A protein has these predicted regions:
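Active-site-facing substrate-recognition patch
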Residues: 1-31
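PRPP-dependent phosphoribosyltransferase catalytic core
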Residues: 2, 114-176
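Residues at the starts of beta-strands that form the adenosine-phosphate
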Residues: 31-33, 56, 95, 124-127
Length: 176
């Protein structure tokens, strides 16, 4: 993929908005578990868990539940081996917030729900995303959104983090 450049969106500011939302929720005594979608969502979740002083967080790898698994092939397998699903909490009856970097079609979230339900039956599942591109193919929406962004269909947002752990989005051309 060819890198086009930085996106107008301030990913770090959007992260802080989501952190504040969860901080307020934690102050009310509301219990929840965080589970990030590999890769970008897991980075966000790891940082949220640290900033909120949470004992643990989960990672969900959707590789084996993707509806385009046949197309992704070895790429999906590499992702699954680099960051496998790990849920260090009881899923049954839990209030779980799924976290991802970008919401576009909803297909990755559908795959994440399938993977999550392989581990149990949560009481509630909410979705938090850093960027919402608003181009659904499935009836899925986020409960918490850092920022809504407009990006041409032939481009993708790629979350990056610097050495200090700060986030930014790069814009790349979609591979055909």
């Amino acid at each position: 993929m060819r890198r086009i450049g930085l996106v107008e969106m301030n990913a770090e500011q959007s992260y802080l908005k989501l952190l504040e939302t969860l901080s307020q929720r934690k102050k009310t005594g509301d219990s929840f578990e965080l589970a990030g979608l590999a890769m970008g969502g897991a980075w966000i979740t790891e940082r949220l868990a640290a900033d909120l002083n949470l004992a643990h967080f989960g990672v969900i790898n959707v590789a084996f539940h993707r509806d385009d698994y046949a197309e992704k092939g070895m790429t999906a397998l590499r992702t699954a081996s680099m960051m496998p699903t790990s849920l260090p909490f009881e899923v049954n009856g839990a209030n779980i917030i799924l976290i991802d970097d970008v919401l576009l079609t909803g297909r990755t979230v559908r795959a994440a729900l399938n993977e999550l339900f392989d581990f149990g039956r949560p009481a509630q599942v909410e979705l938090m995303v850093l960027a919402d591109r608003e181009n659904r193919e499935l009836p899925i929406s986020a409960d918490f959104v850092g920022e809504q962004v407009n990006v041409p269909g032939n481009q993708i947002l790629v979350l990056e983090k610097d050495d200090a752990g700060k986030f930014r989005f790069q814009l790349e051309e979609r591979a055909e």
